[in-house]
Amino acid sequence: MLNSKNNTIVTIGDINYLWGIFLLIASARKAGMTEQFLVGVRDFTPEAEEILKQLGDVEIVSLDGTSRSLTCLKSKVILQTKTDFVTWADSDAFFTGNVSDILLPANEDEIHFRLRANQEMPMAFKGHSFGEDGMSIPKKILETWQQDIKEIAGDAMEAPRYETTGSGCFFALSLARHRRFVEIWDALQEKVLPTHNVGVVDKSLQFYHQLDESTINACLNFVKDAPRVQEVFRMDKERAKLFVHFIAQPKPWQGWTKRAFRFFDDYVSLVEWAVAQGLRLPGEVPSCLKASNKSLMKLLIPWMTLKPKLARRLKGILKR
C-alpha cells in the first residue's frame, strides 16, 4: 500500500467556496485521512487561510492577480505539488469515509478517472454534438483536439483512445511519472481557454465548452505517453467510501438540490464534528447546514433549485 504522505490532495476555490473547501478537508480529517492538501485560492483573507490551515497539513497557493476561471488553473496548482502522487478533488465535494486506500491507481501508468457511459454523453455534449447522436465524442471535436495536441506536444495519437469523456471533478495519478502529461495539459489550457472568468462552462467554445474537463480529455485521448484510464472507478462503489460531488446549484452551504439532499446527514455531520473539535468555522453555520432544519430544507428544495436558474436567466436578459 502506498504511503498516504506521498500523495497530495489538490483543490481550488475562491472565498465563496470557503465552506466547501473547509468541509472537503474536514471530511478527510474526520475519517482519519492524513494526506497533505494543496489549495489554490482567490480573494482569501489571512483569516480564511488560517481556518483551512488549522485542519492540519494544508498549504495555500494564492491565485490573486489572475482573472481566469479557477477551473482553468487546476493544472497550474497541481504542478506545484511536491509529492510523487497527486489526487484532484473539486471543492464542492466530500468523502464519506476514509478512502486513502482507493484514491490512487493501482498502476503508475494509469490514472484513476471516471469515464462516462455512452448514455451520459448527450447531456455532456448538449449543443455540441455537430449533428451526431451525441453518444460518443463528436468527430469534429476529436479532430480539433488531435491537431491542438500535435501543435503543443509535437505529435499525437493517430486515433482517440476513448469513445466517451470523463468527469474532471476527481482524478489521481503519479505526478512523478506523468509530469510531462500535466505540463501538456497546462499548455493546452493556456492555448485554447478564455483568459477571463467564464465560470465552469463556456458554451460559446465549439470544441472546449467544458473547459478543464475538455482539455484533460483531449490530452488523455491524444497525448502519446498519457496515463491509461484505470478500468474500474472505485470512488462510487461503497457507501462508506464515496467521493460525493455536488454538481448543481445551489451548493449545500447555500441550499439543497434533490440529488444532493441524499447526503444531508453526512454533510451536516462534518459541521458538527468541526464544532465538537473546537475548530474555528468559516462563519456562522448557515441554516441549511443545521440538522434541526432538515425538514425545512427538504420542503425548500424546489425554490432553492429554481432561484439560481432565475438568477442566470435574469443575468442573460440584462446582458442583451
Q: What are these regions, as identified by a protein language model?
A:
Residues M1-R320:
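Glycosyltransferase catalytic domains, chiefly GT-A lineage
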